């Protein structure tokens, strides 16, 4: 399924070049994120409290609990997290880059958006998504054991990876998939009917839900969800053969999560899902076959430019303090 034809070989030099630029970006990003060069990001003070042991870590993921048994120096822990995150990304791209245009788009998105949203600000989520890059690849080539191992590693770095445990059977088992559609329909009806208030309260106040939920609302349709839908449509149209089915089921699973969390007023988790699945759709574009169409690439570039504007100018991801 992965592109290995003779026509591809001539582009290896181009891929090598863009990969070198990406490595340079990783190195610079690693330094900037570790030093908080532009000032402390909006989440940095929270991480100081968590990793210094000032805030209770009862629901903190296993990886960080382990690190805190060794040290409670927040700078050391953040350094380890970022080292792992950057190394995993570099290793993945070194092993599985097959599509020059997909790799280029990934590079642009990372340099303009993901570096700042994830590695500069959301350290834990950034490490989790880096590991999930391998998960979607193993899902794509139908390697169940490797898929579950990588997902468990991702869960150990961020609870938002928990739903990925059901992704493999959703993609490869029609019975599980139809059961998933049924459960999703029930949850949607429950939320729309207003009968799910007690269930929402339970989620928000039980364990992990204390972190992923809050009282704010979230609009199901917004600029970020629309950009994700548009990106999927373009990617789906430009994909070839079995890649279409894989991409469709992967995106469908993400949509069901996003809709569920949105309807049950869990905005933190809903936007985590948007960030995660958009990043992973770009990751998939690195190793699948796609039709060469400059119009598709142009529209994808417009989406990336909008996201750059949104995160930096509207959302203010580098909303630094002292």
Residue ranges and their predicted role:
Residues 93-113:
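Transmembrane-helix signature of polytopic, membrane-embedded enzymes
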Residues 132-146:
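Membrane-interface transmembrane helices that cradle and orient dolichyl/undecaprenyl
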Residues 80-99:
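Transmembrane-helix motifs of polytopic, lipid-linked glycan transferases
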Residues 1-28:
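Start-transfer (signal-anchor) and selected internal transmembrane alpha helices
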Residues 11-20, 34-65, 163-279, 312-322:
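Alpha-helical transmembrane segments and terminal signal-anchor/GPI-anchor hydrophobic tails
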Residues 66-81:
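Juxtamembrane segments of multi-pass membrane glycosylation machinery
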Residues 151-167:
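Transmembrane helices and adjacent periplasmic/lumenal helix-loop junctions
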Residues 120-126:
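Short acidic/glycine- and proline-prone juxtamembrane loop motifs at membrane-interface regions
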């Amino acid at each position: 399924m992965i592109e290995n034809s003779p026509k591809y070989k001539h582009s290896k030099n181009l891929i090598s070049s863009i990969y070198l630029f990406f490595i340079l970006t990783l190195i610079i990003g690693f330094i900037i994120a570790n030093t908080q060069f532009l000032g402390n990001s909006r989440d940095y003070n929270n991480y100081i409290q968590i990793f210094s042991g000032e805030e209770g870590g009862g629901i903190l993921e296993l990886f960080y609990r382990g690190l805190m048994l060794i040290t409670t120096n927040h700078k050391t822990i953040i350094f380890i997290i970022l080292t792992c995150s950057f190394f995993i990304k570099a290793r993945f791209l070194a092993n599985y880059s097959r599509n020059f245009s997909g790799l280029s788009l990934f590079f642009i998105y990372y340099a303009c958006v993901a570096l700042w949203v994830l590695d500069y600000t959301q350290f834990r989520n950034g490490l989790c998504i880096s590991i999930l890059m391998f998960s979607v690849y193993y899902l794509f080539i139908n390697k169940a054991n490797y898929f579950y191992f990588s997902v468990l590693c991702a869960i150990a770095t961020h609870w938002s990876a928990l739903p990925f445990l059901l992704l493999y059977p959703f993609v490869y088992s029609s019975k599980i998939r139809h059961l998933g559609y049924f459960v999703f329909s029930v949850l949607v009806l429950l939320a729309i009917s207003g009968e799910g208030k007690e269930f929402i309260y339970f989620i928000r106040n039980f364990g992990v839900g204390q972190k992923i939920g809050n009282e704010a609302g979230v609009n199901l349709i917004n600029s970020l969800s629309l950009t994700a839908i548009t990106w999927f449509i373009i990617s789906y149209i430009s994909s070839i053969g079995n890649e279409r089915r894989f991409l469709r089921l992967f995106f469908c699973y993400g949509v069901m999560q996003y809709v569920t969390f949105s309807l049950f007023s869990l905005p933190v988790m809903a936007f985590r899902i948007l960030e995660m699945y958009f990043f992973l759709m770009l990751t998939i574009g690195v190793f699948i076959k796609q039709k060469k169409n400059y119009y598709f690439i142009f529209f994808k570039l417009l989406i990336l430019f909008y996201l750059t504007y949104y995160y930096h100018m509207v959302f203010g991801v580098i909303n630094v303090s002292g």
